[in-house]
């Protein structure tokens, strides 16, 4: 009899969650990044999300917190290697900040949870923390909400 593989939760983490995880690895965003690197959850991303993360991480403002360029590039490469990179066919325009639409596009295509601390994305969700687009309900928790639910899920 074949062994059943555990279903892994699919997530899309926004740029701020990634950066917060690097600045404070022991914080809640750090726990989320650990879950991704330990392959306990599956991160979905896109070339445009990776480009934004790289651009922000390599900015002079953040390099003083994150270390030298070589270290940052190694982390970004490792993150890319444990993520599923897709090129979404959808192009929603529902966010006040147009740059945030790329997270919705990836989550919609991959049926993933968007983990975010971004006020614009959070403002789009209903009282149950879902964003409804074309009859698809995308869960949009904050990092804290996600960790609380994940810990209940695995216990």
UniProtKB/Swiss-Prot annotation:
InterPro entries: PIN-like_dom_sf (IPR029060), PIN_dom (IPR002716), PIN_toxin-like (IPR002850). Pfam families: PIN_3. Transmembrane segments: none annotated. NCBIfam families: putative toxin-antitoxin system toxin component, PIN family (TIGR00305). PANTHER family: SSL7007 PROTEIN. This is Uncharacterized protein MJ1680.
